[in-house]
Amino acid sequence: MESVRKAFKEATEKYGCVDILVNNAGISENTSFMDYTEETFDKVIDLNVKGVFNTTRVAAECMVTRGKGVILSTSSMVSTSGQPNGVAYPASKFAVNGLTVSLARELERV
């Protein structure tokens, strides 16, 4: 989270508050479920879910203060259909969907 805060601090000092945030990062591992390790699972979840959470949390601070802003999060069709050989990716994108919809409902009136 500190690296995200630092990057946003530098950007806002130079350019001002963030108007639009696009969460578009993601990784997947092409590994069968039986060969999946907790480390591999955590790597995908950390980037795909925690990355969205951390970046959105910092960007939203400025947006809420100003009373405006747009947050877009890309996901994937496999978030609802699943995919073999990469269970963490669809799970992470399902989590991004839930995070984004919940955040939209919470912040729509702020």
Task: Label each residue range with its predicted role.
Residues E61, R105-R109:
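Alpha-helical segment proximal to the catalytic Tyr-Lys
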Residues T56, S92:
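Active-site helix of classical SDR
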Residues S76:
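Residue(s) in the substrate-gating loop at a strand-loop-helix junction
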Residues M34, S81-V87, R109-V110:
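Active-site loop immediately N-terminal to the catalytic Tyr-X3-Lys motif
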Residues S32-F33, T37-I45:
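Substrate-binding pocket helix/loop in short-chain dehydrogenase/reductase
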Residues M1-K6, E38:
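The beta1-alpha1 cofactor-binding region of Rossmann-like NAD(H)/NADP(H)-dependent oxidoreductases
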Residues A25-E29:
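Conserved NAD(P)H cofactor-binding loop of Rossmann-fold oxidoreductase domains
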